Amino acid sequence: MLSKFVEENPHSPFFTPALSELGLAYLNLGQPELSRRCYERVVESAPGSATARDALQGIREIYVADGNVDGYFAYAEKAGVECDTSVMARDSLSFAAARRIYLSGDTATAEKSLRSYLRNYPKGYYTDDALFYLSDCHLKAKQTDAAIETLSELAARPTNQYSARTLGTLSKLTSEAGRHAEAAKAYRALYDVVQTADERAAAATGYFRSVEAGGDDAATLAAAAEVEALPDAGTTAQREAKFARATILRRGGKQAEALPLYRELSREVKTAEGAESAYRVIEATLGGGDAAAAETLIFAFAEKGSPHAYWVAKAYIALGDIYAGRDDSFQARATYQSIVDGYAPADDGIVAEAKARIEKLKK
């Protein structure tokens, strides 16, 4: 009905309003090209009018929805209509177009549009948003390396509304990819931007584990000292840092410096670090020639019910060694045999070690 009226009454005072309504109708029917043509006729027929202004807004929205912001500005210039063609306006509309595509779920097209925005406006007002959306496109497309690159770029920018989410995702991706130095950097930065003590504790743990995974003892010792000084590092990070420090000291022949750390950790044998620490204290005590004290420590360790059977078994092997050192072959053999008969799994070296001790007793 509207289209017929428009075609038959080009000089009617209602021509322009009808044409504008027709443009809106086409838009609602999902025919943006026909809608744009109607709006352009409105601008041409009644330049400078309120109706033309509204039509120009419609034209702009159609171009933006199509991701063709440059097309809109080219039309406006050609039509001779007034509009804001400043860099700021172009920046805003270009991002709006890219964002609209991103929100539509068209990941592949959104990626291209967002990259175009970032390329054309390297210092754009929406750089943070564009980088965040782009990283999400990469994640949805399972493009891990590209996601890491984009997230790293966003993480390097001043703190913004995306910082915590960006660093959380970046730390996880780099850690899973074995990129330990990058993961450590992301986790450490994450500690400084998250809001709760639990979140900071998790970040501190991730930070220390990533540094330690890098295999550099000097870096691990430095990270351990840093973690132990962080107010919200949490018990897990603190414990793992202390244990790593003790282990590095022991490996470096500094047993006297490592022992106090092992003693402190051995108070809680429910953890893997605590269980091994208890054994290391036993080992050091036995190595120092005090078999009686070592025996007492072994029984105390066993009574605590540690779930870490490996280190409990190692302690019992040490107990068998104490008996053997006293020439009590019967007790020594019984201790070793109890491990052979009752320990599992059978392939981690413990059973083989106990059997070797039994064979040694036969000689």
Predicted feature residues:
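Acidic, polar-rich low-complexity tracts and alpha-helical solenoid repeat scaffolds
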Residues: 1-363
